[in-house]
From Swiss-Prot:
Superkingdom field: Bacteria
Gene Ontology biological process terms in this record: DNA-templated transcription initiation; nitrogen fixation
Residue numbers spanned by region Disordered: 44-81
Lineage: Bacteria, Pseudomonadati, Pseudomonadota, Gammaproteobacteria, Enterobacterales
Name assigned to this protein: RNA polymerase sigma-54 factor
InterPro entries to which the protein is assigned, alphabetical: RNA_pol_sigma_54, RNA_pol_sigma_54_core-bd, RNA_pol_sigma_54_DNA-bd, RpoN_core-bd_sf
DNA-binding region: 366-385
Family statement drawn from the similarity comment of this UniProt entry: Belongs to the sigma-54 factor family.
Keyword terms: DNA-binding, DNA-directed RNA polymerase, Nitrogen fixation, Nucleotidyltransferase, Sigma factor, Transcription, Transcription regulation, Transferase
Tagged with keyword Nucleotidyltransferase: yes
Amino acid sequence: MKQGLQLRLSQQLAMTPQLQQAIRLLQLSTLELQQELQQALDSNPLLEQTDLHDEVETKEAEDRESLDTVDALEQKEMPEELPLDASWDEIYTAGTPSGNGVDYQDDELPVYQGETTQSLQDYLMWQVELTPFTDTDRAIATSIVDAVDDTGYLTISVEDIVESIGDDEIGLEEVEAVLKRIQRFDPVGVAAKDLRDCLLVQLSQFAKETPWIEEARLIISDHLDLLANHDFRSLMRVTRLKEEVLKEAVNLIQSLDPRPGQSIQTGEPEYVIPDVLVRKVNDRWVVELNSDSLPRLKINQQYAAMGNSTRNDADGQFIRSNLQEARWLIKSLESRNDTLLRVSRCIVEQQQAFFEQGEEFMKPMVLADIAQAVEMHESTISRVTTQKYLHSPRGIFELKYFFSSHVNTEGGGEASSTAIRALVKKLIAAENPAKPLSDSKLTTMLSDQGIMVARRTVAKYRESLSIPPSNQRKQLV
């Protein structure tokens, strides 16, 4: 065995804690980033928050002071740009610049209001407390409400409710009586045993002289399965109703709510703060970061200056360490926002037809298209478009919304799957309710427009729009 020494020259990019921080900030949503920055403000005395007015007035003075102070404290230079554009799969899985351009007025910015929510059970219990129940009936009512799911239906039988109460003196009839009272709470039809029970309870609240009410009750009571299958021919035969009468009765039934519990807001609301604002100015689409969505950070110059003057080595080291962390955080934030703005502007430029004319004009676009245009890695584009939202005259969209697969057209071109989905929705909206378009017919109509897609693909697009198949869309006209 021969031993020896070899010299090998290689280049390797070190994953520093600062670079890890920059990449992590890139992935955070606005709400998550707000929390992150607030924690930094709370823990680092060298960081402070400033508003836009103060930032504009003091920027030049700060820059001069910062250069003198920081150079004296720390000779190590920071890079001009953080190398965020890399595939760092091993890192994490899940004042800042706002760009120059349009000056948004306060009354032009979108307002995003929070909302309070309560569960269906809380809402029902509030009504129980306002209802003159006896103590026994109130206990029964509580057990019934506990058995109601979010759609408004009982999850267990009345017999099981009787058993769960655990009182031998409470019988089935008493529970049924309380149940009937709760079913007339708001929303009417809640705590129903099944769909038939739910619809009949709602129908019972109509005035007796309501037109077609008896015919509607007959259909719900005895022929709900035929109605569910839109088998109107069989319905006319078994009910012996004329077509016009059947149509009116069905319309009355369709005015009822099959899931009354869902009319009550449940769960936590989802808050969305747009990161990017888009508007048209002088025939040009202008893209700006939402400067109001994040706090602006700066170095506290008074504390920074103490790093040289303090005689306590421990205090001096504490100040220098926090100063360096503050500088890196501000730099990381600037890199994040610069990347977000570049990518957003590129997306808007590529999808101008969408902003001008709507979904049907969405262009097919994948991550690689934007990555190539801005000269970044696809993984960077994926991070910066996840949980980042754009506000435009057409609404609020996650940046990922603008990416879609392509479908070949007859002329050798490509169409976006998003555009095809919008076209399917448009065709169905214009169909004859008595003869709704089947998936095969939709496929043919798309083919006539030069879009070549399989029937199963059309079915997938229709289902993604929550549109039922043609046999369930059929209506009497």
